[in-house]
Amino acid sequence: MRKLDRVDMQLVKILSENSRLTYRELADILNTTRQRIARRIDKLKKLGIIRKFTIIPDIDKLGYMYAIVLIKSKVPSDADKVISEISDIEYVKSVEKGVGRYNIIVRLLLPKDIKDAENLISEFLQRIKNAENVEVILISEVRKFEII
């Protein structure tokens, strides 16, 4: 992978905080030209570093909450089976594979209504066949959320 310079990293950080800034505004912040910003963004997109420009909605105001599900597969090689069992569920918003006490971390987007959330969690847990241990944590408040 090609090494990014300081300006590329700053550009990615700034855009992760506000992707609506114009090339002119970015150029002013980074003390460069609009054309250089355009070239850098094109390069970052081609390298796959910038995958898309998006928003981060306030899920609380939309009537939702997150739950984090920690899963330990029966054996490490079963992790991919577990991931395939759950990845196509609509309210599963991220699935990460890792190393540690739990080897799969899942983020669910659930309605705030506790009965509806409970039903979806039960449905989710029934889909998991190759897990030794599962722990569900309902997120009551997001205090900090940064991409980079």
From Swiss-Prot:
This is Uncharacterized HTH-type transcriptional regulator PH0061. The keyword Acetylation does not apply. The keyword Ion transport does not apply. Residues 4-65 form the HTH asnC-type domain. It holds the Pfam family HTH_24. InterPro entries: AsnC-type_HTH_dom, Dimeric_a/b-barrel, HTH-Siroheme_Decarb, Tscrpt_reg_AsnC-like, Tscrpt_reg_HTH_AsnC-type_CS, WH-like_DNA-bd_sf, WH_DNA-bd_sf. Residues 23-42 bind DNA. GO terms for molecular function: sequence-specific DNA binding. Keywords: DNA-binding, Transcription, Transcription regulation.
